[in-house]
Amino acid sequence: MKNIVRTFFAAALLLSGLHVYAQPQAGDNQRLTPQVMARLFPAGVVSPEYNADGSVTFRCQAPQAQKVSLDCQMLPAETPMTKGENGVWSITVTPGKPDIYPYAFVVDGTKIADPNNMFIFPNEGFKYSLADVRGAEPSVQDIQNVPHGKVSYRFYHSETCGIDRVMTVYTPAGYDPAGSEKLPVLYLIHGMTDTYETWFKVGHMNNILDNLIAQGKAKRMIVVMPYANPYPEMIRQGKAQMYNAMDTDLVTKEILNEVKPFIEANYKVKTDAASRAVAGFSLGGRQALACGLGNPKDFKWVCAMAPAIFGNEYEANFQSGVYAPVGSLNKNLKLLWIGTGTSDFLIEASRSLDGYLTANGVKHTFYTPDGGHTWMNCRDYLARIVQLLFK
C-alpha cells in the first residue's frame, strides 16, 4: 500500500509540471521530512516583494537572457533590470502612491507575465501581472473587515450570438435568493480586450461594493459583468459575423435580450427601469452610452468611464436613433455621468460631449481627475458612481 501511495505521489508531481531536482535518499521515503520537501520543492524567486519602506522589488529568473526590462504603470517608461546571482534579474521601484499596478517583464524583446505572481490581469490581448501596493490605511478597493458579498460565474446560451456564454455576477452580503428582498441591478461592462473577469480581478469591484455598502455610502445592489466581446468565439464556430469592435448594436442586443432576462429570471431583482443602471469603461463606456441612452425605457442610470467615442460622432448617434433624442434625456434619465482622466487619450472627445450636452441643457456630471486610461482611474470611477446609484 505504501508503494502505491509513493507511486501515486510521484506521478502527481510529474503531471503537475513540478521539477524533481533530487531523488529521495535511503530512509527518507518513509515520510516527507523537511530535507525531502526542500529537494522536491526548492525555494523559488519571490516577486513582487513588498518592502517595509514602501518600495517594491520585482524579480525575473532568466539566466540565458541578454536583456530584461520592467514594463509597469508605476514607471513612465520601460526600465532595464539588473542581472544578479543564478540568472535572477531584479529592480526595486517606489510607486507614487498605493494602488494596483499592472506590470510585465520584457525578456529579450518578448513581453511575459511574472511567472512567480499568481495575480494576473485577465485580458484577451496582453498578459500582465498585478502588483497590489498597500498603504498605511486600507483603501476602498482593499479587503476590509466587513461583510463580504459573492462573485459567481454564470453560464448561459445566447440566441443573439448563437453561442454559449459566461458572465460574472456580484451579490452583496446577506443576499438571499429565497428571501423577499429585491435589489436594483448595475450592468457593468469592461473595456476592449478585457473580459468578464477584469472588473472583479483588476477592478476589485467586489471589495469596493462591500466596503461602501458596509459604510452606508452605497445602496445594496447586484452587479452583472457580461462578456462584451462575443466575436472570437463566434468566429471560431464559423458564424458569419464580421468583427467590428466599435459596433455597439450586438452588445446592446445581448444585454437586453439575453443577459437582462437571465438575471431577472434567476435573481431577486427589481425590474423597473429606475432600478437598472448601465456603466462601462473605454469600449464598455461606448457600449454603455449606446445601451443606456438608446433604451431609456430599460435604464435610468447611465455612466460612461473614459468612453471610446471619437470626434463628434455622438451627434450622429443622437440624430440617427442610436441614442434617444437629446431633448428627452432630462425627462428619461435619473443620472448621466461621464468621467475621463485629464491625461487620457480620450479626454478631448469627452470634453466635446460634455460641451454638447451642456449646450443642449442636459443635466449630467462630468468628472475629470488626474490620470490616464488606466484601471487605477477605473476603480475611482466605480467607487464614485455606486454612491450615486438608486438614490
Model-derived regions: residue spans:
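Short beta-strand segments of immunoglobulin-like
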Residues: 45-49
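Non-catalytic cap/lid and distal C-terminal segments of serine-dependent acyl enzymes
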Residues: 23-39, 50-69, 73-78, 83-391
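Bacterial Sec-dependent N-terminal signal peptides
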Residues: 1-26
